């Protein structure tokens, strides 16, 4: 159980039976009266956002969310299949639930599936993923002098900007939080 003074950004609470995450948080102390907490909340099931003001005497239940390690198996139309490595149970998530994480999903990648009352809500990727460059324009020596970048296509179909010396067939490390190139991966 949380009190209003426990509220902070990224806290997950249960409100009216649904899980919410606090995306913005402001403490307001008026000249007279009790303190107020102005929050922007995002429904973790529907994705809807709204603002709400809470009084300092309000209490909240913690959202009963579990994270489960699972392995990405395959894509079937607009559904993504994941498997629990211990029970071999398979679950499907929609393209909306996976979101932008789809750009970095490769076979057998271990991810965290966020569950609310045993229903999947979304996924958390590892911070870094190694992906193969499937399409890259050739480069000429001297192109690196100006510090330019060039677009490449990765094995998932995602396009990112990389240094000009990256070639087709090479494996690179990508930051899944920003979608940016980090380094070349040897071997």
From Swiss-Prot:
Major subcellular location class: cytoplasm
GO molecular function: translation elongation factor activity
Classification via InterPro entries: Elong-fact-P_C, NA-bd_OB-fold, Rib_uL2_dom2, Transl_elong_fac_P/YeiP, Transl_elong_KOW-like, Transl_elong_P/YeiP_cen, Transl_elong_P/YeiP_CS, Transl_elongation_fac_P
Keyword field contains Kinase: no
Pfam families per UniProt: EFP (PF01132), EFP_N (PF08207), Elong-fact-P_C (PF09285)
Keywords: Cytoplasm, Elongation factor, Protein biosynthesis
Function noted in UniProt: Involved in peptide bond synthesis. Stimulates efficient translation and peptide-bond synthesis on native or reconstituted 70S ribosomes in vitro. Probably functions indirectly by altering the affinity of the ribosome for aminoacyl-tRNA, thus increasing their reactivity as acceptors for peptidyl transferase.
Protein's name according to its UniProt entry: Elongation factor P
Organism, scientific name: Syntrophus aciditrophicus (strain SB)
Gene from which the chain derives: efp
